């Protein structure tokens, strides 16, 4: 995993080598320019004095001027060769970097399948300028925190850490794989301990994001989706009991329509996401139900029958919470499974193109496949892909691009 250190050590001398070669190329360029200026002056003097001197002198001067021209041409060729050597040097280091990145990607994929695509997308999101944030979801941040994104919570207790490593590890955090067993166990525990205040205190004091954090080997995309949905349900659980049912549906609709940082689900993590989400939703709703029952018992501590009624209502709330979370998880599973083909299609990102490679054609893409050149010497684009200009084979005779053709027609109509 020391690819970065090895590569940095390899290119340590590259800046000095490039500086020396560019300096040498600049000196050769000045030498050629000075030689050309002197030759132009000699040619002018030669033609001025040609009629006054003998033919032998003219031939001698002509041969000397030609010799100096050939020498300047050789220096110019050497300068071009030096530029090609510099290009090959940089290109060789770029190819080496691509190879090292490919090896590092293979190691990451071996440990966590599909993690490289998530990290690449996250890196692109961090490099793109931040968009205006909705005030209903996230408080306004300072310019130093523009790159931090909080999914859908009104309250933020996470300190800003700019390192990508921390954010990547946060994406790797997932919930337990056996969520269905924990879902049932959570319901039973809530029913059996409805009269114990210590259990209520523990459940209500733990933050939602601390539930069921397990190993990094499971799907990171499923963990991110589960965390976002759980935070939405946590905000719902804090509302009044009369508004909780309708607001839970609204929270689910808002979660379903959210892009969730652009992370696409893989087929392997879809089923896992639904089960882990069921476990998290169960614990959240169970915690809210027990909190309501605790407040009810606290206000009626002197009435024994009222306390028993509160305990029974807590049990019924727990049962309804478990059934609601299971139904919501089942519905989410269907939504995720239906969205998998589209997300797989849209998530195909080509990472092989060099960002410094020239762009051509009206599509502003790199050179690939068969291309045709515009015969207009002043064409700003010059090269076009066959498919972009509606060609299936090489055109016969001269060919002009649509822009140049339209410009020529406009000039022709003006002359008429």
Swiss-Prot record:
Residues 156-165 have a biased composition (Basic and acidic residues). Coiled coil: none annotated. The keyword DNA damage does not apply. Its main location: nucleus. Residues 189-198, 283-293, 302-319 have a biased composition (Low complexity). Zn(2+) 1 binds at residues 361, 363, 385, 388. It holds the Pfam family ING. Component of the NuA4 histone acetyltransferase (HAT) complex which is involved in transcriptional activation of select genes principally by acetylation of nucleosomal histone H4 and H2A. This modification may both alter nucleosome - DNA interactions and promote interaction of the modified histones with other proteins which positively regulate transcription. NuA4 may also play a direct role in DNA repair when directly recruited to sites of DNA damage. This is Inhibitor of growth protein 3. It comes from Xenopus laevis (African clawed frog). The lineage of its organism: Eukaryota, Metazoa, Chordata, Craniata, Vertebrata. The gene is ing3.
